[in-house]
Amino acid sequence: MIDRASITYEHFSELGFMKMPFMVENAWFSGSCEIKTYALEELLGTKLRALYQRKKGRDLFDMDYAMKRVEVDIDAVLRCWRRYMAHGGKTAPTAKEFLSNMEEKLALPEYCDDVKLMLRPGTDFSVDTAYSFVKGSFIDRLATAVVTKKV
């Protein structure tokens, strides 16, 4: 049974909602629409929160995968992360606390192996390489990141 107290629901957007086109064409149906969604930086901000709060290696994979494929505004991601941490009633951890949290998780085989069965064969993924990249991109910047307000 799902513990509903542990599920988070956000009904706001730090960066504003956006619309993305969506289209389906096949023998059964053809159509298009626009889907209301979040900016990538906002999604990565919530993923960074998940990386800190959950013991799921897939969060590390998701951060690494997105960052290596699309240019991302790191400061916007960190701004969103802080907002979502505060929304959940939590104080954003310091860089030292985040590093300690990650070191504990990286010592757990179940954390490191979490994503393996979800990846298609041939997908190249190294937990150590991904952590080094995400750490350098985000965690190391927590101590120096400037918090800017939404305009």
Give residue ranges: language-model regions.
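Structured mid-to-C-terminal alpha-helical surface segments
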Residues: 1-151
